[in-house]
């Protein structure tokens, strides 16, 4: 069974209410049909043949929520109602109000728009002041690696990088079920090179150890030292994760985004995500090039997040 199939099977054991915010897109409509038919989730479709936010009785509650959360951005109730009719904001509002367990958007909206809606309506979880993302890379050899951050935070500070790593490690426990082994990646391994980026990764590693001393982690490590045991023995002897890392933390968005696409297209890996991390309640993004299967997989991922959080 593939990783995507495992996710779907797990979600089907406890189907969750997931808002699909772009029901007017044929891919989303087909994904909703299959999610319902296969009992993977209970889809709540916004747009298309689904809910029209402007006519939904919950619109005023979503508008009030948006106004209360961002009084500096909303001048009055009329503007709040107008903002709440946006399908992505409306979807996020339903999750924040407990009318749904999770939401998925991004098939026709930009990542930036989905992020703004999620932060505005839902907000970040306690201990996580940074929204970030991860891809779950299912390799042909059967391994599943977590790549973070590949879609959201362009140039994280050391503290942000540590919290991004913590969010990824926590979600890996929920989605994959194994013990996270976190590698903070760099072009240097244990002082083999220097520079501002290397310094950032070292500081982030120490910050992570303070945040989560119970989780195995090391850095700075080059990719080969993180993934190949023979290389780790030479470059990082005694590393608690050398050669066996399963959570790869990239120093910036350039590195993370480039890496996941290279592994996807050159190594034949299946990329599940991007999955948002650090939110109070689950909501996630889609690539605008997402297939129906991609939408179903991301829906299963946010459903698993919701189940693990008990929402």
Name the predicted role of every residue range.
Residues 1-45, 52-242, 247-311:
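Anion-binding alpha/beta catalytic cores of soluble intermediary-metabolism enzymes, centered on
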């Amino acid at each position: 069974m593939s990783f995507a199939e495992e996710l779907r099977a797990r979600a089907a054991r406890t189907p969750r209410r997931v808002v699909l915010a772009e029901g007017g897109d044929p891919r989303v409509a087909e994904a909703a049909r299959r999610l319902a038919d296969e009992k993977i989730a209970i889809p709540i479709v916004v747009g298309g043949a689904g809910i029209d936010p402007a006519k939904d009785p919950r619109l005023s509650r979503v508008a009030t929520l948006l106004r209360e959360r961002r009084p500096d951005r909303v001048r009055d109730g009329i503007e709040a109602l107008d903002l709440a009719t946006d399908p992505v904001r409306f979807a996020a509002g339903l999750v924040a109000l407990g009318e749904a367990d999770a939401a998925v958007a991004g098939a026709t909206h930009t990542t930036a728009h989905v992020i703004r809606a999620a932060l505005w309506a839902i907000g970040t979880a306690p201990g996580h002041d940074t929204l970030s993302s991860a891809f779950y890379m299912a390799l042909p050899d059967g391994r599943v690696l977590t790549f973070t951050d590949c879609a959201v935070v362009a140039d994280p500070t050391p503290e942000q990088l540590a919290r991004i790593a913590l969010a990824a490690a926590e979600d890996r426990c929920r989605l994959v079920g194994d013990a996270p082994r976190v590698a903070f990646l760099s072009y240097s391994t244990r002082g083999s090179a220097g520079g501002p980026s290397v310094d950032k990764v070292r500081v982030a590693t120490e910050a992570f150890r303070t945040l989560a001393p119970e989780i195995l982690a090391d850095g700075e490590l080059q990719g080969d030292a993180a993934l190949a045991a023979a290389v780790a023995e030479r470059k990082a002897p005694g590393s608690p994760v050398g050669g066996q890392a399963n959570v790869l933390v990239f120093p910036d968005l350039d590195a993370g985004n480039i890496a996941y696409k290279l592994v996807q297209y050159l190594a034949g890996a299946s990329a599940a995500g991007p999955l948002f991390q650090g939110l109070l309640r689950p909501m996630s993004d889609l690539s605008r090039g997402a297939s129906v299967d991609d939408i179903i997989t991301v829906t299963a991922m946010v459903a698993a997040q919701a189940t693990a959080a008990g929402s």
